[in-house]
């Protein structure tokens, strides 16, 4: 039911981002908080670049499951949909669990002047970076707004540019 009414749910939800390449909203379905992301097609040129390869939603779905398998925190991917026109990819949607908590930027903002950030959060940030390095994973958009503090660890979001590199050379 969520994906059948995805656009309406995004319009009714708490919008985090709208327009451009993606629209993201926190939605509530049967009392459960979820995040619904619509990957938009901006124009014909964008469509020509995207229609022939798996969508960014599909890529995020795969990478979310990869992180889950590797025990790297990320909101659990729950559903993905690629819309097609005459068999060619068009818009795509991703549904994930909602992770409640502040992002890294908000967590560390009070400590910019002093540099005295909470040791637990700093250690957890080092830990997630070590996990990514160990697995040769580059996030593709690794910034403070894409890391959320949840249950004592940093949880990664916005995985559509994530890549696990086959060799150390390609990772470096």
Name these PLM-found stretches.
Residues 42-46, 111-113, 158-160:
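Short glycine/proline- and charge-enriched loop/turn segments
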Residues 142-149:
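Hydrophobic residue at the +6 position relative to the catalytic HRD Asp in the kinase catalytic loop
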Residues 104-114:
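AlphaC helix of the protein kinase catalytic domain
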Residues 118-122:
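Short alpha-helical scaffold element within the canonical Hanks-type protein kinase domain
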Residues 93-97, 153-159:
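A short beta-strand motif that forms the metal-chelation/ATP-contact edge
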Residues 29, 149-150:
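Structural motif
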Residues 2-105, 124-135, 139:
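Conserved ATP-binding subdomain of kinase catalytic cores across diverse folds
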Residues 155-172:
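C-lobe/activation-segment region of protein kinase-like
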């Amino acid at each position: 039911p969520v994906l059948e009414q995805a656009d309406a749910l995004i319009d009714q939800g708490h919008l985090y981002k709208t327009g451009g390449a993606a629209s993201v909203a926190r939605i509530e379905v049967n009392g459960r908080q979820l995040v619904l992301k619509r990957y938009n097609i901006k124009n014909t040129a964008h469509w020509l670049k995207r229609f022939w390869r798996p969508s960014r939603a599909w890529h995020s779905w795969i990478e979310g499951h990869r992180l889950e398998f590797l025990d790297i925190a990320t909101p659990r991917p729950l559903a993905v949909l690629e819309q097609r026109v005459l068999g060619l990819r068009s818009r795509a949607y991703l549904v994930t669990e909602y992770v409640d908590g502040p992002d890294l930027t908000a967590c560390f903002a009070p400590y910019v002047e002093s540099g005295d950030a909470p040791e637990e959060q700093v250690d957890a940030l080092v830990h997630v970076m070590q996990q990514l390095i160990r697995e040769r994973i580059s996030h593709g958009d690794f910034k403070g707004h894409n890391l959320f503090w949840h249950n004592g660890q940093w949880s990664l979001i916005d995985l559509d540019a994530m890549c696990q590199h086959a060799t150390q050379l390609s990772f470096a």
